[in-house]
C-alpha cells in the first residue's frame, strides 16, 4: 500500500521463477531470524512450497516438497505455522486423510518430522482446516474435517 493508500504490485512469482504449483489453496507466513517466508499449499500439485520474501519485496523459491507415501498432505487444503522452543513447525492437511508436521529450517528448507493418518480412532478424513498452538506439554493440533 502506497502512502496515498493505493495498491501497487511489487513483484509476482510463478513457474518461470521455479514455483511449480497449480491453484494455491492456502498460505501462511513466518519469520526466522531476519528472513521472512511464505509457505504455499497447492492441492492440485500435492505440494508445499517455501518462498522467501526479501525486505524489498523480491521473492525466491527456497524449497518445494511433494506429497509422498510418508507424508499426509496430498490435496492440501490447510497449512498452519507454529513456533515452539525456538523451532518453526509447519502443519499441513487435506484430502490425503491425515496431518503432516514439518520443521522449517533457517534458509527455507522443510524437513518432514511426523504424520498422523486417518484411522477409526481419528477423524482426519478430508481435512478442511487446522490450527496449531504451543502448550507446556508440546504442540496441540486442532483439525476440522469436511466429511
Q: Language-model features: where?
A:
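Feature marking well-ordered beta-strand scaffolds used for ligand recognition
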Residues: 1-147
Amino acid at each position: 500500500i502506497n502512502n496515498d493508500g493505493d495498491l501497487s504490485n511489487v513483484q509476482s512469482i510463478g513457474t518461470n521463477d521455479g514455483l511449480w504449483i497449480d491453484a494455491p489453496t492456502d498460505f501462511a507466513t513466518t519469520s526466522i531470524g531476519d528472513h521472512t517466508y511464505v509457505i504455499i499449499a497447492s492441492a492440485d500439485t500435492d505440494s508445499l512450497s517455501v518462498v522467501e520474501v526479501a525486505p524489498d519485496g523480491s521473492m525466491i523459491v527456497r524449497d518445494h516438497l511433494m506429497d509422498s507415501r510418508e507424508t499426509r498432505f496430498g490435496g492440501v487444503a490447510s497449512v498452519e505455522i507454529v513456533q515452539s522452543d525456538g523451532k518453526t513447525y509447519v502443519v499441513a492437511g487435506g484430502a490425503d486423510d491425515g496431518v503432516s508436521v514439518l520443521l522449517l529450517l533457517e534458509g527455507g528448507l522443510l524437513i518432514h518430522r511426523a504424520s498422523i493418518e486417518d484411522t477409526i480412532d481419528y477423524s482426519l478424513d478430508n481435512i478442511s482446516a487446522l490450527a496449531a498452538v504451543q502448550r507446556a506439554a508440546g504442540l496441540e493440533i486442532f483439525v476440522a474435517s469436511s466429511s
